Amino acid sequence: MLRVLVETRPPRARFVPGAEKEPPLYAFLLSTAVIFVAELGDKSQLMAMTFATRYRVRDVLIGITAATALVHLASVGIGYWVGDAFADSQDTIAIVAGVAFLAFAAWTLRGDELTEAEANKAKSATGAAILAVGVAFFLAELGDKTMLATITLATQEGWLGTWIGSTVGMVAADALAIVVGAVLGRHLPERVIKYGAAALFAIFGLVLIAEGLGWF
């Protein structure tokens, strides 16, 4: 199924900002779903819930959106460059991407919690809400699995759709955590989320590997 979608898409354009008039729907939907899953149970959700106890939810979400957009713009730039530089080795890239998603599955099972320093920083944040939240999330997302997942997706899909989709997916997941925390007064069901997200990562990784090997 994924191979059919890939083969029917138009040739990849070079990475030129503004070159695409509309975000590719496939890349947008795929990236939104994958990053939403990657963010479930992530430390960023805990940070979002903590910040929401100090600042207005609107300001928290604006800060998260700004930070995510910047980090993921860099991520898709890296991923798209890799995909473009190795355009003649797409099968190999698919296999490597598949292995990466299997690693993300293991990472998810291991869990990702706030360190004491990160928790204290979120609780004691002062100053302009949007700036405080934005800086904290920007630093927290550098090297995080959502950033790495975005890079991996961008090696396979259009950069603009991946950028917008990954940003929407992360903000939606963090907004969900804030709402659940505010309405229900508790975290999302950690065990169910952990195993469900890991399973989805593993399935997607295996599909990519199978495509790279030409099995379907």
Segments the model singles out, each with a brief description of its role:
Residues 4-24:
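Short, Lys/Arg-enriched N-terminal segments with co-localized hydrophobic residues
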Residues 20, 24-25, 110-121, 160, ...:
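Structural preference for solvent-exposed beta-strand-turn elements
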Residues 22-87, 149-171:
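Juxtamembrane transmembrane-helix termini in multi-pass membrane transport proteins
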Residues 26-30, 60, 94-97, 125-133, ...:
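Residue-level signature of transmembrane alpha-helical entry/exit and packing/kink sites
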Residues 56-122, 179-187, 193-199, 206-209:
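Membrane helix-loop-helix hairpins that form the core translocation module of multi-pass transporters
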Residues 100, 132-136, 176, 202:
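Interaction-mediating elements
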Residues 118-149:
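Selected transmembrane alpha-helices and immediately adjacent juxtamembrane segments
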